[in-house]
Amino acid sequence: MYEGPVQDLIDELGRLPGIGPKSAQRIAFHLLAAEPADVTRLQEVLQKVKEGVVFCDICGNVSEEPTCRICRDARRDPAVVCVVEEPKDVLAVERTREFRGRYHVLGGALDPLSGVGPDQLRVRELLTRIGRDEITEVIIATDPNTEGEATATYLVRMLRDFPGLNVTRLASGLPMGGDLEFADELTLGRALSGRRAV
């Protein structure tokens, strides 16, 4: 156990998702050994992200402007919306180059044990979009884990209120319990192409 600012840095890094105590320690000592200009550049980038990145007014993806580039792109099909849990999942689907519609980012998944219910997600905004815009298909692309499946089931129930709306789910091929962001492009592309009605 270290003391003072070194331990504070290790503790803060350890709070980041996917960073355990050993990784936090490795990163902290890397930063201590780095050139001051490199540390300053990292600090500036973190500050810019915190001050300059917002969530898109329409879909909830990250953006430097009130409306993200995907929602502004007239070449995208506004009638097809892919629902994902997090902005990182938008990037995962985009890497497939299979999807030409738009997105809706929920901001998480249902997780009653952690206190995350429908009101903590952007479900209401999705329902408003479907009622307001001419959306004909909703592709549910939540993670293939317990929380993602619960979220998908809940969304399917809510979307039944929209007659004529085609609701589909990504096809199998994604490992149960996995995260969408870690799926390779080929697997995710095939899951998107082979989506099924729910």
UniProtKB/Swiss-Prot annotation:
Zinc finger (C4-type): 56-71
SUPFAM superfamilies: Recombination protein RecR
Entry's Gene Ontology BP terms: DNA recombination; DNA repair
InterPro entries found in the cross-reference section: DNA_Rcmb_RecR (IPR000093), Hlx-hairpin-Hlx_DNA-bd_motif (IPR003583), Rcmb_RecR (IPR023627), Rcmb_RecR_Znf (IPR015967), TOPRIM_dom (IPR006171), TOPRIM_RecR (IPR034137)
GO molecular-function terms, A-Z: DNA binding; zinc ion binding
Keyword annotations from UniProtKB, A to Z: DNA damage, DNA recombination, DNA repair, Metal-binding, Zinc, Zinc-finger
Function: May play a role in DNA repair. It seems to be involved in an RecBC-independent recombinational process of DNA repair. It may act with RecF and RecO.
Family annotation (PANTHER family): RECOMBINATION PROTEIN RECR
Family from the record: Belongs to the RecR family.
NCBIfam families cross-referenced by the UniProt entry: recR
Protein name: Recombination protein RecR
Species name: Saccharopolyspora erythraea (strain ATCC 11635 / DSM 40517 / JCM 4748 / NBRC 13426 / NCIMB 8594 / NRRL 2338)
Biological classification of the source: Bacteria, Bacillati, Actinomycetota, Actinomycetes, Pseudonocardiales
Recorded name of the encoding gene: recR
